[in-house]
Structure formats: C-alpha cells, structure tokens
C-alpha cells in the first residue's frame, strides 16, 4: 500500500482518496492503514479523504496546500487534531465522520478538552460515533474558528459539551446530535445536557440560518 501511496505523492496527485471498507464502527481494535510519514508531509495534496486510516500518536503534519480534509471511521486524540490543524494552514473544510475522541489510552480521555482552533477554516462538520467515552467523565470540545461560515454537529456526542469561543462569522449551523444517557443518573445527565445546549444556542442567536433536529430536543 505504501508503494501505491508514494506513487501518488511523487506524481503530485492533488485529490487523494484513501477509503478502506469494513464495519462503520471506528473500532480501535480493527486493522487500519497507518498513514506513512511521507504522506503526512506531502505538500501537493489539496483534497484528502481518509476512511479507516490512522495517524501516529503524535504525527508530524505538513499539508501546506491542503484545503479539504475528510476523516471517517477513525479514533482521534487531542494531539492528533492539534497537529492536523497546525500543519494545514490553508485548510478551509474539515469533516470528521463516524469518529471517536479518546486519550492516548482507553482511560485517558476523561475530562480532557479538545480544541479545534483554525483561522482558515470555513466549514466544519462533526458526526460522532457512539463510543466508549460514555463511560468517562464530561469533556469539552472547544471550537475557535473566527472565519467559520458553516457548522454541523450530528451523530452521537455522549458527555460532550460544545463551546464556541471568539466571535464567529457563522451564517449557517445545523445541530443534529444526540446525547444518550444510561439509566443510572439519567435525570442529572439530562439536566447537564439541557444547560449545555441552552448555552450553545445562546451563542448562535445571531446566526441567519439555524437548523435543530429532534435528536437535540
């Protein structure tokens, strides 16, 4: 596989799709293609779509020409997301689909914040998978992207609090995520979720177009 991928980089392929197939679950025990170092420092790609691919724990990323990145069926840590954003200064569109957020080991994510910080980003789509984080504590996903125009949050986002920082330029937002709860502590969980959702909506009052699905309510 690495030989084929190297062929695409040496021939300066701009749109690269590495999409492998299997169950939709981003199961960390399932074999996934480990992204080669030379691909992570490829300066010619403008669009990169990854499915069932995985990054090194603390990857070195240098995608200076990349404008569109789509990652699906993957487990991501805070450090991975930070390195991706720092190494992609021209990135305008980021889509994370069927993904899970986790720590460097199975129990390291509890209470950890994830920051999505980018001045170039204009479109952000987050679609979460029902993951093992339901057994952990609450964690905050902080979105700091002053030039963001479109935001979509959907899928399973158990014990996730979304926080918008700085003044955003949003013109359209779609909220379709579900915060499932176990029977134990259900009332307190829903109370926390209700307060978090209210806080998020107050940040979105100025948005010209806001769509909220029944999952959120």
Label each region the model flagged.
Residues 1-110, 115, 118, 128-137, ...:
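Leucine-rich repeat
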Residues 14-19, 46-51, 67-72, 92-97, ...:
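Conserved hydrophobic beta-strand positions in leucine-rich repeat
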Residues 44, 137-139, 158-160:
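Residue-level marker for the onset of beta-strands and adjacent loop->beta junctions
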Residues 113-117, 141-143, 164:
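Short C-terminal beta-strands that terminate individual repeats in beta-propeller domains
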Residues 144, 152-217:
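Extended repeat-based solenoid scaffolds, especially LRR ectodomains
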């Amino acid at each position: 596989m690495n030989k084929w991928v190297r062929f695409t980089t040496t021939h300066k392929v701009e749109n690269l799709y590495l999409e492998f197939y299997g169950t939709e679950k981003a199961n960390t025990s399932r074999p996934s293609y480990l992204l080669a170092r030379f691909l992570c420092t490829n300066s010619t790609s403008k669009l990169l779509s990854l499915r069932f691919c995985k990054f090194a724990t603390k990857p070195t990323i240098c995608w200076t020409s990349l404008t569109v990145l789509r990652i699906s069926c993957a487990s991501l840590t805070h450090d991975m997301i930070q390195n991706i954003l720092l190494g992609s200064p021209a990135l305008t569109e980021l889509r994370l689909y069927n993904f899970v957020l986790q720590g460097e080991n199975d129990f390291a994510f509890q209470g950890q914040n994830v920051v999505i910080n980018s001045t170039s980003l204009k479109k952000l789509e987050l679609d979460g998978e029902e993951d093992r984080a339901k057994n952990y504590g609450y964690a905050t996903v902080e979105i700091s992207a002053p030039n963001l125009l479109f935001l979509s949050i959907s899928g399973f986002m158990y014990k996730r609090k979304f926080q918008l920082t700085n003044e955003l330029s949003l013109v359209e937002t779609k909220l379709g995520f579900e915060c499932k709860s176990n029977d134990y502590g259900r009332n307190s969980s829903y109370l926390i979720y209700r307060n978090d959702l209210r806080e998020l909506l107050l940040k979105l009052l100025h948005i010209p177009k806001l769509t909220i699905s029944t999952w959120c309510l």
